[in-house]
Structures are given as C-alpha cells and as structure tokens.
Amino acid sequence: MTIQIDFIDETNEVTAEQIETLEQLIREAAAVENVPEGAEVSVSFVDNERIRVMNRDYRGKDAPTDVLSFALEEEGEGEIDIIGADVPPVLGDIIISIPKAKEQAAEYGHSFMRELGFLAVHGFLHLLGYDHETEEEERVMFAKQEEILTRFGLTR
C-alpha cells in the first residue's frame, strides 16, 4: 500500500530516523485501513504557540493541544462528493505539537518515539473518519490505535 506522506518539521527537533519510523507506521495504518493507493497526507511538527493558535482558530479552544487533524475529504451537510473514483484522495493534514509530545511521553513514562507514533496514528485515524465524541467511538478508535501500534511494534 503506497501512500504519499509529506513531513514538515517547523521545530527542527525530529530526526530523519524518527520521520522514517513515522512514515513506516503511517503506511502500516494505511494498509490496516485499506486506504486507496496514492492517497496523500501531510504531517507537520510545530511548537505549542503555533498549535495553540490553530486550536483557537479552528476549534475555539485557546490552549495548546497535542495533535490536530484537518480532513480534506469530509463532506459538509448538503454537499455532494465530486471526487472521481480514479482520483487518489488527499486525506488531509496532521499537526503535532513537539513540546506536548515530549511532555506527554514523560508523563506516561514511555519514549518520545512512542508518543509521536501514538499522535500520528491518532491524527491519521481522524482523517479516515474515526472520532471519540462518545464512549463507544472512543473505545473503537483507541482499540484501533493500539492494534496498529502493537502490530508495528511500537508499544509502551
């Protein structure tokens, strides 16, 4: 399963090796979820101020968060799907706060790489339509995250 993944590191704190691991992990998640060949996603690493502004502007929450996802394939109410069947989907953007990832890795007692992987998979699943607004949705989404991370070998 080949998908196009673009990484943008605004922090210069993520190593080439960590990016390679995340690329493999996202490809694994795409395979598990049967994402169409040629789909595209971008992953950006930012600081707390940048993600705080995005969280405020797009979610109305004026505080930094760990990960945001912006799905480009979501249909709004009353919209029709105009994407051709043969056009690879642009899934959207995943934005990860590096300071939050480091803080949470320390808080949960696991590696920075594990936390980055968790946040990347979490964001990726949001792009595919998973959510955690209800207890049932949360159970399904978090079980899927753990399945992918365990299958990849990125455990706590």
From Swiss-Prot:
Keyword tags: Cytoplasm, Endonuclease, Hydrolase, Metal-binding, Nuclease, Ribosome biogenesis, rRNA processing, Zinc
Stored SUPFAM superfamilies: Metalloproteases ('zincins'), catalytic domain
E.C. number(s) listed in UniProt: 3.1.-.-
Disulfide cysteine pairs (residue numbers): none
GO annotation, biological process: rRNA processing
Binding site for Zn(2+): 122, 126, 132
Cofactor note: Binds 1 zinc ion.
Cofactor: Zn(2+)
Gene3D superfamilies reported for this sequence: Metalloproteases ('zincins'), catalytic domain
Molecular function in Gene Ontology: metalloendopeptidase activity; RNA endonuclease activity; zinc ion binding
Subcellular location: Cytoplasm
Listed GO CC annotations: cytoplasm
Pfam families documented for this protein: YbeY (PF02130)
Entry function: Single strand-specific metallo-endoribonuclease involved in late-stage 70S ribosome quality control and in maturation of the 3' terminus of the 16S rRNA.
Family: Belongs to the endoribonuclease YbeY family.
Name under which the protein is recorded: Endoribonuclease YbeY
